[in-house]
Structure formats: C-alpha cells, structure tokens
Amino acid sequence: MIPSKMMSANPEEDPLDTFFQYIEDMGMKAYDGLVIQNASDIARENDRLRNETKLAYLKEKNEKRRRQEETIKRIGGEVGRGQDASYAGKHFRMGFMTMPAPQDRLPHPCSSGFTVRSQSLHSVGGTEDDSSCGSRRQPPPKPKRDPSTKLSTSSETVNSTAASKSGRSLERAEGKFTVPASHSPPRASTSGHLFPSPGSQERNIKVSAKPRPHSDEYSKKIPPPKPKRNPNTQLSTSFDETYIKKHVPRRTSLPRDSSLSQVCSPAADPEEEEPVYIEMVGNILRDFRKEEDDQSEAVYEEMKYPIFDDLGHDSKCDFDHHSCSSQCATPTVPDLDFVKSSGPCTPKGLLCDIPPPFPNLLSHRPPLLVFPPAPVHCSPNSDESPLTPLEVTKLPVLENVSYMKQPPGACPSSLPSHGSSHAKDQTGALGPAPGASILSSSPPPPSTLYRTQSPHGYPKSHSTSPSPVSMGRSLTPLSLKRPPPYDAVHSGSLSRSSSSVPHTTPRPVSQDGAKMVNAAVNTYSAAQSGSRSRTPTSPLEELTSLFTSGRSLLRKSSSGRRSKEPAEKSTEELKVRSHSTEPLPKLDSKERGHYGSSSSREPVKAQEWDGTPGPPVVTSRMGRCSVSPTLLAGNHSSEPKVSCKLGRSASTSGVPPPSVTPLRQASDLQQSQVPSSLANRD
C-alpha cells in the first residue's frame, strides 16, 4: 500500500510500484503452487502408503492362501486326495476340487458307508500302494480316526522312526498281512478296525497299545469304554436289584447274562462296551418275558393287589358284601340275573367275574347308588299311564283270578287317573320289580330278580330319604311297612286319592295297605306305633337298624314265614290287586325262602321287607314274632276287601291324603302283601 501511495504521490515511482506488485504476485503464485504441490505430494504419498499396505496385506493373504493350497496339495499327494475331504470343511476350494477323487475311489473301501474319513483312509491306502513311503502310509489312518493334522504329523514322526517296523510286525502277528506296512490292506484293516468291528479294534488296541505311538489314541478311546462299563454295571446292578427284589430268580439270569457277554467278547476290555449293551438287552428281554409270565406283577400290578384284597374281602365278608351288593339298590341287571340264576352265593362268584375293582366299588357304593338302580329298571315311561294296562294285564299273569277281577273293576276308574301314578309309586316303591313283572309274561322270575334287588337294595338304600327320585320310587318297603297301621286305617279311604296324587309314593300300596291296615290295625296298632316311632329317619339309620336286627330276624323269620303262609294267600290276592306292589312281595318271599339259608343279611332284609314286613317291621325292631304274620294274614283275609273299597272311594273322591298316611298305608299293604307273597310262594 505504501508504494501505491507513494506512486500516487510521486508518479515517477509507478514503475517501481508495479514491479513490486508483480514480484509479490509471482511470489504468491509460487507459494500457492508449492503448497498445492506439497498437498498433492502428501496425498500421493498417503495413497502410495495406503496402497502399499493394502498390497502387502493382499500379498500376505495370497501367500497364505498359496501356502495352504500347496500344503493341501502336498498332503493330497502323500495321503491321497481323499485327505482333502477331511479338509473340505476348512478349505472349501480345495475340498471341493479334491472331493471327486475320494468319491471316485468309493468302490475301493470295504465299507463305503463310512464317513469321508474312512473313505479317505481306504483311498489313501490305494494311493500309498502306488507310492512306497511306508512311514507316511501308516499315519493317514490315524488322521482318519482323528481328523486332526497333529495326530497325522505325530504319527508321521513316530512312524518315521520305529512305528513302521512295529506296525509291520504287529500286522504280521495279527496274521492278516505279511505285506509291509506300505501296502494299503493292512493299513485299511487297522484304520477300519477303529470303525467297523470290535474284534479288529481289540486287535489294534492290543497290538498297538504297547509298541505303537497310536497307543495314545487308543488310550484316549479306551477310557470311554471304562465309563461305559461302569454305568452299564450300575445300570445292570440297579436293574438286577430292582428285579431281584421283585423276583428272586433274576439272579440266575444275571450270571447267564454275564457269561453270554463274556462269550460274545473274546477280548474283555475292548468288547466290554458292547457286552454291556448285550447284557442289558438280554436282561431286558428276560425281564420282559418274565413280566409276560407275571403280567399281574408289572403291567397289572395295581389291579392285581386290589384284586387279592377284594378276594379276601369277599371271602371274609362273603355274605356281607354280596348281600350288600345285591341288596344295595346298585342292582345292576347282571347282579340281579346272577342272584336269580345262581342263588344267594352265586352273586359273589358272578361279581368276581366282573373285574375286581367293580365289586368293591359296588359293595361300598350301595347306599349312594340305591336310587339310581330303581330308575334304571323303572323307566320313566314305565312309571307313566302306559303301565296301567300293563299292570292290569300283569294281574292275570299273577293268576289271582278272584281278586284280579276286582282290581280291574275297582281300579279301572281309579287306575286311569292314579293308575299311572299308582304304577309309578308301586314301581318306585317296589323298585324295578313292578316294571319287570309288568313287562314279563311270567312275573315271578323277573320279580324274583327284582325282589332280591328291592329287598336288598331298598332296605339298604332305604329310599325313604327325601330325594326326588326316592320320593317317586324309593319309598322302601321298610318305610312303608313301618308306619303304624292305625294311621294306615285312617288313610285307607285316602289311599286311592293319594295314589292319584302323582308324588305320594304310598298310594299304590295304600289300597292294599288300607285293606291290610284295617285288618291288622287292631292287632298291630300298638306294636307298629312303637315301631313307627322307631322308624329310621334316614337311610343310614334304616341300614343300621336292619343290620342290628338282621340276625335275630333271620332266626325268627323262618318260623314267622311258616305261620304266615296259610293266611298269606288271601293277602296275596289283595296284593294282586295292588298290581305293581304284589310282584315284589311275592318275589321277596321267594327270595327270602332262597336266601334265608344262604346269606344271613339278605334273608334278614328280605324278611323285614317281605316275610315279616308289616308287623315284622315292628317285630323286627321288637324281635319278629311268627304270630304277628299269622294274625296279619287272618286280618288280611277278613278285612282287605272293605279296605280296598274304601281306598277306591277315596281315590274316586280324589281327596289327597297326607303323605304320611300313604306311607303308613303302603307299609301296611306291604305287610299284608309279604305274607300273601309267602303264601303264594309256598
């Protein structure tokens, strides 16, 4: 700037100023050029360095690759290109390139199924046959065994010294080949032994374990067998222990197994691996055979012991369980059939035929199942009006002609209305018997089945319990019998009306009940009043009372039945009128006759229910008297007709009687019916 000012001041100085300016500009240009050159040089240098390093890295990489390839090629030449297969995992290119070679040689190896290693071994053997480098030829098998190169190198080094000689001598000792180790067959055999056959392995182990360096590999392999042996021995021992506990004969089988395993394995150490498995397998097979023999112990073990318990139970409580099972309203049709066909003792045998768990369940279940069985036999349809005609027809089947005429006449009016309800109640109270008797042209046999069922099932179940099913069906004969006769007398007129009422179970019994009650009220009012007070409120109480009074009742019932028989016929006729009720009482009396001797409890229940039901109910509590049945029978013969008439009128009137009255009437009716059934039976 100064020069410019000066120039401005002194125009002469302009050339100098311009000169300086020019110099300055040139210097700046040179400087800029240098800077740029420097920068470019620096950049170029950096690029060069970068490229050099990169190239060096690439060169190193390439060199490494080249070396690897060279080594692979060299190894392939020595061991055979099959060896490349082992490297295939590491060096993909070479592996793929060389892979075809081992594949081409696949036919050579004895075991083409082996992995690439085994193939490579065999292929190596083939190549080595061409090249006579014995020391190198032996090592390849080891790499096959262990694909690690270290093993091969170590084997090579060792083999170079004495391994080749020892290997040859060993192979000769084996007797496989006297050919020097350079030949592939011995090598293949040694290498093959590792994989294919335990026998060859044992030989290799024995021969090479001591002199060969391979012994290290063998020793490595040997330890695993030992653990196998130990676990196997433990397994076998635990196996044996568990089975020895269960079956002593197992011990004999174990020695057998050990001997077999020893026989199978000429060389104990190497083959113990397999023998162990063989031993285990043999034991298992033997165990399975034994288990087949003792299926109950193993497969059905759980069921087997329960079965024995059940058998013991049955033998001990023969009568108890069977009376209970048959008595329990659990009456399955088969149960009833059994009882009917084979008598009191047969039910047990038949029950035993059923798989063991079921009889036990039935014996314990009965009180709960009491009600269902009745429904099963008394289908809802059977309870309904359609049964009324069946009942009417059933009366003729019963063959009480004189009274049957009356029931149809008297019942026609009442039967239509309450006939269905009557049938329901009767079927319900009597249990499945009514339906069966109705359906069967010959009521007595089915009734016999059902009678056993009803006396046992109902007394035991004591369907007096208020459950709706029990209300409909389960008014047990006991409950019906027990109510005091004097109540029944009053309800005699109401019985029919009550029967018209759909839910009053006693109605069906009430007709006959009223008749019987009128006859027996005078004689038994006092006794039954006592018994009524005793009538159990709950099924359990009834059961307890039944069992307590059972034995005494059984003794007295036999005499009671005999006394009742003469007069029972008239009562039986009355029972015929009570269509659905009658078949059961008859059956009860029959069954009582059959079962009285066979099972104490069954007869007791049957007698309570059947033979002595009316008064005996009282007497059963009080001690049954043979006289009461006779009196009852006499009363029945004299008064039942009147009571029936009353019952019909009441039913016609449709006056609903108290439920208690129907129950009492039913009880009276059943009482009278039981003697009548006894008479019919006799």
UniProtKB/Swiss-Prot annotation:
Residues 112-122, 151-167, 187-202, 230-240, 255-264, 449-468, 520-538, 667-682 have a biased composition (Polar residues). The modification Phosphoserine is found at residues 120, 238, 463. One of its GO terms (biological process) is neuron projection morphogenesis. Residues 98-271, 407-682 are annotated as: Disordered. Residues 562-594 have a biased composition (Basic and acidic residues). The modification Phosphotyrosine is found at residue 300. Expressed predominantly in brain where it is present in the neurons, but not in astrocytes or oligodendrites. The keyword Phosphoprotein applies. Residues 150-161 are annotated as: Involved in CYFIP1- and NCKAP1-binding. Keywords: Methylation, Phosphoprotein. The keyword Phosphoprotein applies. Phosphorylated on tyrosine residues by FYN upon stimulation with CNTN5. Phosphorylation begins at 16 dpc and persists in adult brain. It comes from the Eukaryota. Interacts with ACOT9, ARHGAP26 and PIK3R2. Interacts with components of the WAVE1 complex, CYFIP1 and NCKAP1; this interaction mediates PI3K-WAVE1 association and actin cytoskeleton remodeling. This is Neuronal tyrosine-phosphorylated phosphoinositide-3-kinase adapter 2. It comes from Mus musculus. The lineage of its organism: Eukaryota, Metazoa, Chordata, Craniata, Vertebrata. The gene is Nyap2.
